[in-house]
Amino acid sequence: MPQTVRAYTGAIRDTVKSFWHGLSITLSYLARRPTTVQYPDRTPMPVRDMLPPRYRGFLEVDSGICTGCQACERACPIGCIQISLEKDAANPKQRVVTQFDIDEAKCMFCGLCVEPCPTGSIQHTREFEGTHKHIRNLVFRWADPMNPFPVYKVDKNAEYYPRVPLGSLVRQRLETMAWDRSAPQFLPPEPPKPAEAKPAAKAAPAAKPAAAAPAAPAAAAPAAAPAPAKPAAAPAPAAAAAPAAPAAEAPAAPAAPAANPESK
């Protein structure tokens, strides 16, 4: 009995000791400086300024130094960049960019489009906050079809091409767009479907051509000499007559009994 009580009280003592040991570790963190902060309310500076310079955020295009080479469009492995060029109506020798769309929601931020750009027109920014109600609002259109921009002519001797501050164009777009605005229509409306053609009425069968008149008999040719008659063929031998079948013998009639002379 004493051992049972001693074991019971020892179990209670171990439980209380382990409880306060774990709680002391938790309480020790209350006096420490937190290593995490609540985003985005309590950051000491904008998060984009805390990111490394080579961070790959939203893509930005400086149309002032874009050559329209479409190297970025060809390098994109998922086809999120669409570029269209046309000749300027006023100057046919000058090409203009009528479409430069980047689907930021589809982009995988690989950076392959930035590497082949000869002037650095397209660059990754440190902007990443793009919360929108409609995903189509993340398709950035850097060219206006109604007001296209001319392509930039590259200076082969230039070592640097000045551009606008990196991230300023994307930041301006994100700040002016409401998160719940209606989705734009990027695709042209579908052309109306042509009306189904009714089957044409069957044409009446063509009249049969009239029978041609019989041709006039040709002039009788002079009678040819009669051909010599062929010798008559020898008559074929008559087929041998089959032997007549023997007549069936009729059964003989029974003989009449002889008359008894004593019966007279």
Curated annotation (Swiss-Prot):
Gene3D superfamilies, alphabetized: 3.30.70.3270
**Which segments show compositional bias classed as Low complexity?**
197-264
* Catalyzed reactions: a quinone + NADH + 5 H(+)(in) = a quinol + NAD(+) + 4 H(+)(out)
Q: Which Pfam families match?
A: Fer4_7
Q: Which InterPro entries match?
A: 4Fe4S_Fe-S-bd, 4Fe4S_Fe_S_CS, NADH_quinone_OxRdtase_chainI
Query: What molecular function terms (GO) are annotated for this protein?
Result: 4 iron, 4 sulfur cluster binding; iron ion binding; NADH:ubiquinone reductase (non-electrogenic) activity; quinone binding
Keywords (A to Z) from UniProt: 4Fe-4S, Cell inner membrane, Cell membrane, Iron, Iron-sulfur, Membrane, Metal-binding, NAD, Quinone, Repeat, Translocase, Ubiquinone
Membrane-protein topology: Peripheral membrane protein
Q: Where does [4Fe-4S] cluster 2 bind?
A: 76, 107, 110, 113
- Its main subcellular localisation, reduced to a broad class, is membrane
Q: Could you name the domain of life of the organism this protein comes from? A: Bacteria
Cofactor entry? [4Fe-4S] cluster
The UniProt annotation puts the region (Disordered) at 183-264
What GO cellular component term, any one, is given? plasma membrane
Residue numbers binding [4Fe-4S] cluster 1? 66, 69, 72, 117
Instruction: Tell me which residues make up the 4Fe-4S ferredoxin-type domain.
Output: 57-86, 98-127
Where located?
Cell inner membrane
Its EC number is: 7.1.1.-
Q: What does this protein do?
A: NDH-1 shuttles electrons from NADH, via FMN and iron-sulfur (Fe-S) centers, to quinones in the respiratory chain. The immediate electron acceptor for the enzyme in this species is believed to be ubiquinone. Couples the redox reaction to proton translocation (for every two electrons transferred, four hydrogen ions are translocated across the cytoplasmic membrane), and thus conserves the redox energy in a proton gradient.
Subunit structure as annotated in this protein's UniProt entry: NDH-1 is composed of 14 different subunits. Subunits NuoA, H, J, K, L, M, N constitute the membrane sector of the complex.
Question: Would you identify the family this protein belongs to, as annotated?
Answer: Belongs to the complex I 23 kDa subunit family.
What is the name of the protein in this document?
Answer: NADH-quinone oxidoreductase subunit I 2
Provide the species name.
Anaeromyxobacter dehalogenans (strain 2CP-C)
